[in-house]
Amino acid sequence: MNTKAGSRLEKVLKAGEFAVTVEVGPPRGPNAGAIIDKARLLSGVADGYNVTDNQTAVVRMSSIAASKILLDEGLEPVMQMVCRDRNRIAMQSDLLGASAFGIRNVLCLSGDHQKASASGKLKGHPGAKNVYDIDSIQLVSMVAGMRDRAVQEGGDPLTEPTPFWIGAAWTPLAPPTDFRVFRLAKKVQAGADFIQTQAIFDLRAFAHAMQQAVDLGITEKTFILGGVIVPKSAAMLRYMQRNVPGVVVPDALIDRMSQAKDPLQEGVAITLELIAGLRAIPGVKGLHLQAIEAEHLLPEILQAAGLLPRPMGI
C-alpha cells in the first residue's frame, strides 16, 4: 500500500474499511491526566482521535501538546489547526514541531469566531484579535506543499518533508447549500486527503449533498467521514438548531427528545439510527463521532453500531 503519511487512519481508509474518528477535547488547564483518562477510556474504539484547537475560541491546552499525550498513550491523534489564532509563520513552525513529535494527521479548519467564547458562564475573550492570515483552503495547500515538495509557503525549502495525512471540514447543509460542494472541491484540489463533515441530523438533505459530491467526482479523490453528535437533550438539539451554522435539526427530532422518558438513552438510539443512515449513503467512507462531555458513551455506541472491534493488522 502506497501511503503519504503512514498513519493508521490513512491505511484504514485506503484498505476500504469504514473508518471511525472520535473527538477528544483538551482541558481548560495544564492537567495531562485529563487527557490520559480520556485516552484510556477510548483506547481501541477509533482509528483517529481528533484533538481540538481552542474549540469555540475557549482557551484550552494546545492541540499539539494534547496530541503528543495521546501518542504517548498509544492513540493516533488527528491534530486540529485553526486559522484564527496564528499567522502562516507560526502555523508552519507548529507543523514542524508536530511532525517531529510523530503526529501524522492534521485537520485544517477556519476556527470558531472569538465571540463564541463568551457563552454560558464563560467570559471568554470576545475582544481578542483574530488573525486569519490565510484561510482553511490555503492552509490545506500550505500543508500539502510542506509534505509533497518540502517547501515553506513562501517558497523556501525545508530540510525534510512533513509526512501528514491532511484533513479538512465540510459543512454541506449551510446556506447557500449548492455553493458548499464547490468549496469542498477547492479543498480537495488544494490537497485534502480526507474530509470530516459538520454534524448531520437530516439524512435526506445530506444524501442530496453527497450525491452532488459523487456527481462532481469528489468522492473519487478524497475520503468523506460523516459527522454525528450524540444528542443529550431536546435543549441541546434546539441550541444547535438555532446557533450552530450549518447544522440542520428537524423539529421532529427535537419533539422526539422532548417526549423521551430517558433523553440520554433516546439520544443514543437516535445516534445509532444516524450512523446506520450515513453508512447507507453512497460515497460516505467513515464516521466522525462526537459525544460532548459524554465520552463514556462512545464504546457502547460503536459496539451497538457494529463498528467494534476496529480493523486489526493495519
Regions found by a protein language model. Name each.
Residues 1-48:
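Conserved N-terminal beta1-alpha1 strand-loop-helix module at the mouth
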Residues 2-3, 7-10, 31-33, 57-69, ...:
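Active-site-adjacent beta->alpha loops and helix N-cap segments on the catalytic face
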Residues 15-20, 45-48, 73-77, 102-104, ...:
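Short, well-ordered coil/turn segments that N-cap beta-strands
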Residues 19-34, 55, 77-89, 164-179, ...:
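Active-site mouth loops of central-metabolism enzymes
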Residues 23, 49, 98, 187, ...:
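Conserved, mostly hydrophobic/aromatic
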Residues 49-59, 81-82, 108-109, 194-202, ...:
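Catalytic beta/alpha-barrel core
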Residues 83-101:
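Glycine-rich anion/phosphate-binding loops
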Residues 130-159, 169, 173-174, 216-276, ...:
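Active-site pocket-lining/capping segments in soluble small-molecule metabolic enzymes
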